[in-house]
Swiss-Prot record:
Name of encoding gene: Havcr1
One matching Pfam family: V-set
Ranges of Low complexity composition bias in the record: 139-175
Family membership: Belongs to the immunoglobulin superfamily. TIM family.
Name the UniProt record assigns to this protein: Hepatitis A virus cellular receptor 1 homolog
Disulfide bond entries: 37-108, 49-60, 55-107
Amino acid sequence: MVQLQVFISGLLLLLPGSVDSYEVVKGVVGHPVTIPCTYSTRGGITTTCWGRGQCPYSSCQNILIWTNGYQVTYRSSGRYNIKGRISEGDVSLTIENSVDSDSGLYCCRVEIPGWFNDQKMTFSLEVKPEIPTSPPTRPTTTRPTTTRPTTISTRSTHVPTSTRVSTSTPTPEQTQTHKPEITTFYAHETTAEVTETPSYTPADWNGTVTSSEEAWNNHTVRIPLRKPQRNPTKGFYVGMSVAALLLLLLASTVVVTRYIIIRKKMGSLSFVAFHVSKSRALQNAAIVHPRAEDNIYIIEDRSRGAE
């Protein structure tokens, strides 16, 4: 029994996991964003509320807007509005001039009469800043320039010099030699860097982002959209059905177990009663037999006295 209770408790804890699925809606800061929510009016027109956070068990928490099925009867701010036809079941929420703080969970609750009949849908809103754009720029390239080495050479010259002036025979001329000096300029190359400034256009949040590297060369990158999440109402009903089936199975198991235990107890009691009755019958038979023998002796004594 304890193991069954632990199993059922674990199952009930796992049930909310199937309900916590929600659809992601994206928006851009400064632009209006619409969170879709519709219901079928075949069963009648009913009230609807929008709130922040996950859908509670009843009503809406942090109510943003409320309708009576035909028009808006309450709104917490002028930025919240329902632009669809409310009487036809279109109760999509539009947030004007969205800001970054609008990101988070939103609950659309359509109140349908009956137990657990409300249509609850939870959405995750992601508001991101607009991506700035810049005009396309054409890359420029400068070819490297090369200079040839330049060599400057000087010829040696002999300059006659005399150390002193005298009347004597002049001494041999002294010469001064200049060695040539060679200066070489090595070639150097200058290369200009090529800069490319790709430009981006703002994403329209429908899965397409356009990127351009040149004014004449554009290509489009497709971003896959996230698959829509499963319907939380169906998950809730499936979880409740599984829980009800397990509870029914548990109840039937308890009833069968009690029936078997009671049958065993009744069988043991009948056996004890039969044993007791049998022992009492044997005791009664043993008591009656000596009394019969006493009666015989009394009759014989009386017959002898008569003689």
